[in-house]
Amino acid sequence: MKLLSTLAALTLITAAGTAHAADPNAGRNLAATCANCHGTNGHAIAGSGLDALAGVEKAKTLQKLADFKSGVKPASIMHQISKGYTDEQLDLIATYFAAQK
């Protein structure tokens, strides 16, 4: 019974990860939350003091997100926000913003 429960859980986790990868809008949908502070499509509002995310190299964004998630980089709210995403989701978000101009 325990083995069956474990297999069912693994199947659901795998299916959820595959669903994100198969959805061409997954990165955009996940990144929509970022617009509240960083502006629509990552174009920060002038004078806000927040970093623009649009067009930033994917690796640079991923490193910043990893630093926020681990607590290495100081932040007021990004620690909590970044911890709410899986590494796969953060990768999708970084890919989306890197493609924005």
Task: Identify the residue ranges that each predicted region occupies.
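Detector for the c-type heme attachment site
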Residues: 37-44, 98-99
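Gly/Gly-Pro-rich "capping" loops immediately C-terminal to redox-active cysteine motifs
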Residues: 42-70, 79
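Bacterial N-terminal signal peptides that target proteins for export
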Residues: 1-7
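C-terminal capping alpha-helices of c-type cytochrome domains
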Residues: 70-73, 82-101
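Stable alpha-helical elements in mature extracytoplasmic
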Residues: 23, 30, 57, 64, ...
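Residue-level hotspots at or immediately adjacent to binding/recognition sites across diverse folds
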Residues: 21, 40, 81, 96
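The canonical Cys-X-X-Cys-His
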Residues: 32-40, 93
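Electrostatic cytochrome c docking/interface patches
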Residues: 12-31, 45, 49, 67
